Amino acid sequence: SWGRKGCTPVVRVRGRGSGRVSMAGLTCYKPGNRSRMFYSVREYRGRKGEPKGIGWRDLRDLLVRAHIQLGGPIVLVWDNLRMHLAEPMREFIADHADWLTVFQLPSYSPDLNPQEGIWSLVKRDVGNLAAADLGQITRAVRRRLKQIQYRPDLVDGCLTGTRLITDG
């Protein structure tokens, strides 16, 4: 923007600017099978009583959905997000130890987390969006995540980028 000398330009925008889009995801690998990615998206508009983001129940539901669709046990490698360490989440993990094993990544190691690569792909796409409202951002995020789900080569790239998984 520009303005006259000595006058600060003011850009008027629509909306309150008090919304956000939160994402949670699982990047899945099984030797001999194609890589998979599961996700959950939540929109927060600032309404009374509305959750501000993804909660432990959303993560629980995402894990259960992945377990059902994958049809087998899950070894989960997680970062140290506070929600991952919450007491109800730890209880859920303990109650489902027959199909769920969890390892924590070291602190401050996003380079070891393949899901960070997925988020980078989404943000690179959505970052260039001039959205009119929060709903448009949410739709763009969901659309990009759906595209990534159908591109196992992108998921593979995020997995091999961590060097935690190698082919052969």
Role assignments for model-derived ranges:
Residues 26, 74-80, 103-106, 159:
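Short beta-strand segments
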Residues 56-75:
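Short, basic/hydrophobic alpha-helical segments
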Residues 79-80, 87, 103-125, 135-137:
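RNase H-like two-metal-ion nuclease catalytic core shared by retroviral integrases
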Residues 19-21, 72, 98-101:
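Short glycine-/polar-rich loops that comprise or flank the Walker A/P-loop
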Residues 115-168:
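C-terminal anion-handling pockets and recognition modules
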Residues 1-61, 162, 166:
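Extended, low-complexity cationic-aromatic segments
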